[in-house]
Regions:
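Bacterial N-terminal signal peptides that target proteins for export
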Residues: 1-7
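Bacterial N-terminal signal peptides
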Residues: 7-17
Length: 205
């Protein structure tokens, strides 16, 4: 997964007409079934973000993320992108410097299947199309329903939600960006300096 591909798909997904017409979702969790949640902590240079991964509704995506967590492959990586959408937006991080740390791409779990939604606090996988997600992920600071799956667009797979640390998410989103780095739609969205991910680990519920 490359930053460039995610930029193109995301730009198409959040075009102004789509954002203007979509009704915002109200919950990052599927309400119909009790979820088995796996809590993890993302320790950053700006503070801690606690995320509950939804093993019940997004088992493939959760297992993939935990594979990276349990093998410490996120440790020392960065949040490298802050994309503003209206008064909110999203922050993106993952493995961008060493392809040897990447595992194989995973099957896509669309929001139409999981019942999870791209709302404030949701964690989702970046992708270059269905079945291409690997390590890169993003956390939403606001509802962006246009990132959910539709009949013609697989969207982005949500697999959990922030339970603590939204202040840190918003602080990263508000951090300085380079006016020149980034290609195409990514220009002006690359954090400078990047925000260090010190470690990611499982924590007790």
């Amino acid at each position: 997964m490359t930053v460039r591909f995610f930029a193109a798909s995301l730009l198409a997904a959040i075009s102004a007409p789509a954002l203007g017409q979509a009704a915002p979702a109200t919950s990052a969790q599927a309400p119909a079934t009790q979820a088995e949640l796996v809590p993890i902590a993302i320790e950053t240079s700006l503070g801690r973000i606690i995320v509950a991964l939804d093993k019940t509704h997004a088992p493939v995506t959760t297992a993939n993320f935990l594979h990276y967590v349990d093998t410490h492959r996120f440790d020392g990586q960065n949040f490298y992108r802050a994309m503003h959408v209206g008064d909110g937006g999203l922050i993106q991080g993952g493995i961008t410097t060493d392809a040897r740390k990447l595992y194989a791409p995973i099957a896509h779990e669309p929001t139409s299947q999981t019942g999870l939604h791209n709302v404030a606090g949701a964690i989702s996988m970046a992708n270059a199309g269905a079945g291409t997600a690997r390590s890169d992920f993003f956390i939403l600071a606001s509802d962006i329903p246009a990132l959910d799956a539709t009949a013609t667009d697989p969207g982005f797979a949500v697999f959990g939600h922030v339970t603590e640390g939204m202040g840190v998410v918003k602080q990263i989103l508000a951090s300085p960006v380079s006016p020149t780095k980034g290609e195409g739609a990514m220009k002006g969205q690359m954090l400078e300096p990047q925000i260090k991910i010190l470690k990611v680990e499982r924590v007790n519920p």
